[in-house]
């Protein structure tokens, strides 16, 4: 079966969209009319070309790909419309295995005037009834047909388990010459293995009354051994998964737990490879998940602010530790942040494991359904491209931070919008002050508006400066593609220390580590989309309270002041001390001030060079 359009590599899709965007309006509309039946939707996509940096072909293919259109369908349409240059871009991606003719032969499945969207719906109907699905072909002038058999992309192996060590032995199937029990025992270690009898006794043979929850790949039970409570994760095969998926999941889970030893990562206490089941054993978390506590499950009291921020700090440090080992969690959400008896957070249920290899239509439909359940914590670029990077974990941490700050669940089908991320991303650029101007206090005003609208009231009183700093930290995770997790950790840690009432000497580098803070030099950012907000802490010039001769603060310094309040400078930090006036005329004077009009012009010129302002806004009033 041909692969789907959304499985095309990014470089192939970029070349294809760049080629199709240069077509004449007539040719492009002719191509699009075969794809979309709804003229309103077609005009909506066509109107996006007025937005700078938006490829209307990419939007069109995204719309079509989400309806499970195949690459073969796209290739047949391009050949039918004689757009051979665009078709050749796809053909160059994979070698052509069989070409019977240079002219495509169209069948009666799709005729001119009958758009491809209808054929996609027919395909979905056949999938539901269990009938075999064949990509539609297009009628042509010749009797022969060209069918380019594009092989499916390689198996999505455990790409998230990026390590410098050789993983070839782990990614292969277990050897037939080595017993399975012996292979897994060498992987996990004898000290971790439980006997099948012990697991059955501890869980009362997995009694349904001991079941806590049901997951995608496992059921979770509570059990006891010698009076100590444990959690047992019983792995199970999915109808849509490929052969050996349980073994691969088990193998990857043990790998991750053995490599990670961190106070905020849920430890693996044992595992069992019985004849009838696979099981993983974890410590029992007395206070459940962060999601349950935020939503008051079981009548629990709301978490106070010191506990909330301490939990966020622990989560960020756990993810930072995983990233230092080149491990991507891929499943960061509030329900996977477990709390022990002391409310210490433990990050659990990593999804960094090999995906099933059986790419049938039922598996694809099931995977899409499961994928939509986690969309609330995933960035838009991952949803479109599907490439798992550290950016996915950082974005998910931003959503968890937002849940803690607002008390609003990440997904609510009775709310508009359904996802919390859409609510925040809509509110960020809709602040009363234009966020593209980089004026003084823009981010502070934006954070203040969000706090006034959505800050959790049941957790008690949180100082305004601390709340704004946490909001800006969450926005940093959500809006900046190259966001540094160390910056977010520094901001949250500063607020945590202030709430604890401890007097600490914070570095003057602020939220950013290793970032230059030269005057009138904007921070380089890489935004997720083309909105005006760049999610970075923009350049400001505000005097430090109490320092009469200090230079204007940069974004990093002011961000730390927002996070930690007014903190006196450490005497050992020379960079924080106000510079002495120059003794002669040859020295650079920090007292030179630029008037506001010239400063604004310089900032606007920088924005103009970044193509964030046009000439009218640059020289306008």
UniProtKB/Swiss-Prot annotation:
Domain Death per the UniProt entry, residue ranges: 13-94
An annotated GO BP: lipopolysaccharide-mediated signaling pathway
Sorted UniProt keywords: ATP-binding, Nucleotide-binding
SUPFAM superfamilies linked to this entry: DEATH domain, Protein kinase-like (PK-like)
Domain Protein kinase: 206-476
UniProt KW Repressor keyword: no
PROSITE patterns hit by this protein: PROTEIN_KINASE_DOM (PS50011)
GO cellular component: cytoplasm; nucleus; plasma membrane
Note on domains (UniProt): The protein kinase domain is predicted to be catalytically inactive.
Family label: Belongs to the protein kinase superfamily. TKL Ser/Thr protein kinase family. Pelle subfamily.
Name recorded for this polypeptide: Interleukin-1 receptor-associated kinase-like 2
Organism: Bos taurus
Lineage: Eukaryota, Metazoa, Chordata, Craniata, Vertebrata
């Amino acid at each position: 079966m041909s692969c789907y359009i959304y499985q095309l590599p990014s470089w192939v899709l970029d070349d294809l969209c760049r080629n199709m965007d240069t077509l004449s309006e007539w040719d492009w509309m002719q191509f699009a009319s075969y794809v979309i039946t709804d003229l309103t939707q077609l005009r909506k996509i066509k109107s996006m070309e007025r937005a700078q940096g938006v490829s209307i072909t990419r939007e069109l293919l995204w719309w079509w790909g989400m309806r499970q259109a195949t690459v073969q369908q796209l290739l047949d349409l391009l050949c039918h419309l004689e757009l051979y240059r665009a078709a050749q871009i796809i053909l160059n991606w994979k070698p052509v295995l069989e070409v019977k003719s240079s002219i495509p032969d169209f069948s009666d499945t799709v005729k001119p005037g009958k758009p491809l969207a209808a054929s996609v719906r027919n395909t979905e109907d056949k999938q539901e009834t269990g009938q075999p699905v064949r990509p539609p072909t297009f009628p042509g002038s010749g009797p022969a047909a060209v069918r380019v058999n594009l092989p499916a992309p390689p198996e999505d192996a455990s790409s998230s388990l990026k390590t410098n060590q050789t993983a070839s032995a782990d990614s292969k199937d277990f050897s037939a010459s080595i017993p399975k029990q012996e292979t897994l025992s060498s992987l996990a270690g004898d000290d971790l293995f439980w006997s099948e009898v012990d697991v059955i006794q501890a869980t009362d043979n997995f009694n349904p009354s001991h079941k806590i929850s049901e997951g995608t790949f496992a059921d979770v039970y509570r059990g006891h051994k010698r009076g100590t409570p444990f959690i047992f994760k019983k792995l199970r095969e999915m109808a849509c998964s490929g052969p050996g998926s349980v073994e691969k999941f088990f193998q990857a889970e043990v790998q991750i737990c053995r490599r990670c030893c961190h106070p905020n990562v849920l430890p693996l206490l044992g595992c069992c490879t019985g004849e009838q089941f696979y099981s993983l054993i974890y410590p029992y978390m007395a206070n459940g998940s962060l999601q349950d506590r935020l939503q008051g499950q079981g009548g629990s009291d709301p978490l106070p602010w010191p506990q909330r921020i301490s939990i966020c700090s622990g989560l960020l440090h756990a993810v930072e530790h995983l990233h230092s080992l080149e491990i991507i969690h891929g499943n960061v959400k509030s329900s996977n942040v477990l709390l022990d008896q002391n409310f210490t957070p433990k990050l659990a249920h990593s999804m960094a494991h090999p995906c099933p290899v059986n790419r049938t239509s039922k598996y694809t439909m099931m995977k899409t359904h499961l994928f939509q359940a986690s969309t609330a914590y995933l960035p838009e670029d991952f949803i479109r491209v599907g490439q798992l990077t550290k950016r996915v974990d950082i974005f998910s941490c931003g959503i968890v931070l937002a849940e803690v700050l607002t008390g609003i669940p990440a997904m609510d089908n009775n709310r508009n919008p359904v996802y919390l991320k859409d609510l925040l991303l809509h509110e960020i650029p809709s602040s009363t002050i234009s966020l593209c101007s980089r004026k003084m206090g823009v981010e502070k005003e934006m954070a203040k508006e969000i706090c006034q609208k959505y800050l959790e009231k049941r957790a008690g009183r949180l100082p305004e400066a601390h709340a704004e700093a946490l909001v800006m930290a969450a926005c940093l995770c959500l809006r900046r593609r190259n966001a540094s997790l160390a910056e977010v950790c520094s901001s949250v840690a500063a607020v945590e220390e202030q709430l604890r009432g401890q007097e600490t000497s914070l570095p003057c580098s602020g939220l950013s580590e290793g970032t230059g803070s030269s005057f009138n030099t904007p921070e380089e950012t890489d935004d997720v989309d083309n909105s005006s907000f760049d999610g970075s802490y923009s350049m400001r010039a505000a005097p430090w309270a109490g320092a009469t001769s200090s230079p204007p603060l940069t974004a990093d310094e002011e961000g730390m002041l927002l996070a930690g309040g007014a903190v006196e400078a450490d005497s050992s930090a020379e960079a924080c001390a106000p510079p002495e006036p120059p003794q002669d005329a040859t020295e650079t004077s920090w007292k030179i001030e630029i008037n506001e009009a010239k400063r604004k012009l310089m900032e606007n010129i920088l924005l103009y060079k970044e193509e964030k302002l046009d000439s009218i806004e640059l020289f306008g009033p």
